Curated annotation (Swiss-Prot):
GO biological process, one term: tRNA 5'-leader removal
NCBIfam families noted in UniProt: rnpA
Gene3D superfamilies: 3.30.230.10
Transmembrane feature ranges: none
Gene coding for it: rnpA
Annotated GO CC locations: ribonuclease P complex
Naturally occurring in which organism (per UniProt): Mycobacterium marinum (strain ATCC BAA-535 / M)
InterPro entries: Ribosomal_Su5_D2-typ_SF (IPR020568), Ribsml_uS5_D2-typ_fold_subgr (IPR014721), RNase_P (IPR000100), RNase_P_CS (IPR020539)
PANTHER family (alphabetical): RIBONUCLEASE P PROTEIN COMPONENT
Single Gene Ontology MF annotation: 3'-tRNA processing endoribonuclease activity
Subunit structure: Consists of a catalytic RNA component (M1 or rnpB) and a protein subunit.
Protein's recorded name: Ribonuclease P protein component
Function description: RNaseP catalyzes the removal of the 5'-leader sequence from pre-tRNA to produce the mature 5'-terminus. It can also cleave other RNA substrates such as 4.5S RNA. The protein component plays an auxiliary but essential role in vivo by binding to the 5'-leader sequence and broadening the substrate specificity of the ribozyme.
Length: 120
């Protein structure tokens, strides 16, 4: 699971990442990546999840969120401390395995950083 310091909680962070960040679309997730212009010395990368009701029932949405948090955690060490990532789950994400979600998330992050021209 993600620690509290690695979770996005404020809507302003979500909005800035989604609106100003680089977006990559995968079959089951959309990944938004943004490097914050200002970050404190003790800052760490933050990840936020968007799981819409279209994904399924509350139980299915929670299951997808748990899977995404689980696969996002090991990727934190590859991110810059100022990086902000929002993962939007698409309805088809409830039918796929965690391994497939991890592969899509890795691919989405790689493509987003290539598009942004940022080093990791």
């Amino acid at each position: 699971m993600l620690s509290a310091r690695n979770r996005m909680r404020r809507s302003t962070e979500f909005d800035a990442t989604v609106r100003q960040g680089v977006r990559t679309v995968q079959p089951d997730v959309i990944v938004h990546v943004r490097r914050a212009k200002e970050c404190a010395a003790d800052s760490s990368p933050r990840v936020g999840l968007i799981i819409a009701k279209s994904v399924g029932t509350a139980v299915e949405r929670h299951r997808v969120a748990r899977r995404l948090r689980h696969v996002a955690r090991p990727m934190l060490m590859n991110l810059h401390p100022c990086d902000r990532v929002v993962i939007r789950a698409l309805p088809s994400s409830r039918h796929v395995s965690s391994a497939w979600l991890e592969q899509q998330l890795r691919s989405g992050l790689r493509r987003a950083f290539e598009s942004a021209g940022a080093d990791r």
